[in-house]
């Protein structure tokens, strides 16, 4: 029985580590069939960090979120102005944002909350967020639905 418990525990730990490693990666796909995967650490190292403190409608308290501006990500991976961006979550939920939002509201792909990595349990590893305190008129269901969490892929529609 001890051996069986040990084997089950070993398999669980192995799966949890693999799952955790995969969860900390973000796939960026272009409509012209090119894609790349970037880790949380690479996002932190390759892009300027953008932070803001805001109150999200589903949280009791304001929190400080840090991440990369979506516009910085698209500037690297899609230098021509993209048409639309789609965000996919681990549970296959999808949301889209218009390119105008990138300039006007500067949403971020957040990877930390109050200085800590966002776990899957806390809606991570990546979340698309708007600064609702800076732009209170965005605190409406239409924009709440765009603030997707547990992001695992960003699809950039740019190719003709």
Say what each PLM segment does.
Residues 8-17:
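Bacterial N-terminal signal peptides
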Residues 1-8:
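Bacterial N-terminal signal peptides that target proteins for export
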Residues 22-160:
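N-terminal intrinsically disordered, low-complexity segments enriched in P/E/S/T
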Residues 3, 18-20:
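N-terminal cationic leader/targeting segments used for protein routing and processing
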């Amino acid at each position: 029985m001890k051996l069986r418990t040990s084997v089950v525990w070993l398999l669980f730990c192995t799966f949890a580590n693999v799952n955790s490693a995969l969860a900390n990666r973000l796939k960026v796909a272009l409509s012209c069939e090119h894609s790349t995967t970037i880790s949380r650490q690479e996002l932190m190292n390759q892009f300027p960090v953008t932070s803001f403190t805001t109150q999200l409608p589903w949280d009791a308290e304001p929190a400080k979120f840090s991440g990369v501006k979506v516009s910085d990500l698209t500037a690297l991976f899609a230098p021509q102005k993209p048409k639309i961006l789609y965000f996919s979550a681990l549970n296959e939920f999808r949301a889209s944002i218009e390119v105008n939002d990138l300039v006007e509201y500067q949403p971020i792909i957040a990877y930390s909350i109050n200085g800590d990595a966002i776990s899957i349990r806390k809606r991570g590893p990546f979340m698309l967020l708007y600064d609702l305190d800076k732009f209170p008129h965005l605190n409406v269901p239409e924009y709440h639905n765009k603030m997707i969490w547990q992001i695992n892929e960003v699809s950039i529609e740019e190719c003709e």
